[in-house]
Amino acid sequence: MTPRTPRYAVSRAAVSVTSVLALLALGACSSDPNSIAEQAKKGDQKGYIAGNGAIEQIPVDQRLKPVTLEGTTLDGRQWSSTSERGKQVVVVNLWGSWCPPCIEEIPDLEKVWTDVQAAGKPVQFMGIDFREDPQRGAAFVKTQRMTYPSLTDESGVLILAFGRQAPTSPPSTLVLDREGRVAARANGAVSATTLQGLIDDVLKSES
């Protein structure tokens, strides 16, 4: 009698085939080596893209209402995402000095921030110092030489602005399109290559 294939094996195979087909479909839409689709084809950041759901890109016609994120930066300035609406893509990164993965991804975030500025791309970075005394957060920013601004969020309420799309814990990164809608999310530390790909894909989706 021929042994039966375990049901879980069939399910896993089906999921794998579905993931591959989805990535191939994405690849057909882009030839940009920085795009997430091209990264998937090459295998870069494969764990993020094909399997654990850490990266999500939202098509233009499926994006929800604009997010209004506002607060006080660690250097005492008032800021609102509405001031960027219609002009710039906003990259929001949730972090804390008490979070080891957050510390590890800082060089990658800094690299992308420096690169988009040098290239003159319409992109603004804004961190959220999550559940931390602002003085401690400000000292950490100085020590780590973080050049992009961050909002202070000692009470942990700013993420409520994202509604059901709110990140659950740091590190998390969200990319808002120029209309202020969440266009991409990365749950967990993100590499410079992946973040640049997400940003470029959002910029192209609105061109």
Predicted region positions:
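Thiol/disulfide oxidoreductase modules built on the thioredoxin-like
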Residues: 139-147, 153-206
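Aromatic-flanked redox-active Cys/Sec active sites in thiol-based oxidoreductases
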Residues: 93-99
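N-terminal targeting signals for export/organelle localization
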Residues: 1-70, 207
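Structural microenvironment flanking redox-active thiols in thiol-disulfide oxidoreductases
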Residues: 103-144, 154-161
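Hydrophobic beta-strand anchors of alpha/beta hydrolase catalytic cores
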Residues: 91-92, 125
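Short cysteine clusters
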Residues: 29, 99-102
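A short beta-strand-turn-helix
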Residues: 61-63, 68-90
